[in-house]
Amino acid sequence: MAHPKRKISKTRRDKRRTHYKAVASQFVECSNCSAPVLLHIVCPECGHYRGKLAIEKALAV
């Protein structure tokens, strides 16, 4: 197996890892039903996307 030739300092290691970070999901409000929805995703509550009906939702009886 490969072995490092030199010790990598904590600073150098951490500088390499600066791009690995957690990013929070962006939520927006649905323009039709005001439910929180992920960006660029059809609303799971009403089926609308950008003001148009994208998915026919079955009515709950």
Curated annotation (Swiss-Prot):
Name used for this protein in its record: Large ribosomal subunit protein bL32
Keywords: Ribonucleoprotein, Ribosomal protein
Disulfide bridge partners, by residue number: none
Keyword Lipid metabolism: no
InterPro entries cross-referenced by the UniProt entry: Ribosomal_bL32, Ribosomal_bL32_bact, Ribosomal_zn-bd
Single GO molecular function: structural constituent of ribosome
Assigned GO CC terms: large ribosomal subunit
Domain of life: Bacteria
One GO term (biological process): translation
Family (UniProt): Belongs to the bacterial ribosomal protein bL32 family.
